[in-house]
């Protein structure tokens, strides 16, 4: 999720070598909202609640909706791989 955010950060500023123009235009607020909604929708808590009617955080493999949104936002706002180092943050901030 963090790396996806980094991609969003740089996608509109990476120039095409032939034209010198960015490959993509800057994402709109609606597109960013859609990306955040997608990150939220694939959170283990959201998936478990919909599939089983309850949440068991001991079985999560990809993180909660809140965690996934937070890491996407971290990557998007920072544009830095270093900001995505999950080993460098306290476990409560994963």
Give residue spans per PLM region:
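Short helix/loop segments within enzyme catalytic domains
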Residues: 2-45
């Amino acid at each position: 999720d963090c790396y996806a955010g980094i991609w969003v950060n740089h996608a509109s500023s990476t120039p095409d070598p032939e034209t010198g123009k960015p490959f993509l235009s800057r994402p709109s607020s609606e597109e960013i909202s859609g990306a955040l909604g997608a990150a939220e929708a694939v959170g283990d808590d959201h998936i478990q609640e919909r599939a089983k009617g309850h949440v068991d955080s001991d079985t999560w493999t990809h993180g909660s909706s809140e965690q996934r949104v937070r890491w996407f936002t971290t990557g998007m706002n920072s544009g830095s791989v270093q900001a995505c180092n999950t080993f460098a943050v306290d476990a409560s901030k994963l």
